[in-house]
Amino acid sequence: MHVGMGVIFQGEGGGRTDRNVYRNELRFGDLAEPLGFESIWGVEHHFTDYTMCPDVLQYLTYFAGRTERI
């Protein structure tokens, strides 16, 4: 079985700034490989005007350069 981790970059409400949400999501992505996850998934928000990650491919490319197996 392959287990991946999805990072959604969603910060509406909750009292956190967009900057803090973004930093935390990047930290979660950094933990994927050390915790044994085999993939990182990005999310496209097709049906809402709100998104903090407008280019999922760029985000996944960023993590491809920071990991060895993912």
What is the role of each PLM region?
Residues 1-67:
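N-terminal beta1-alpha1-beta2 module of alpha/beta enzyme domains
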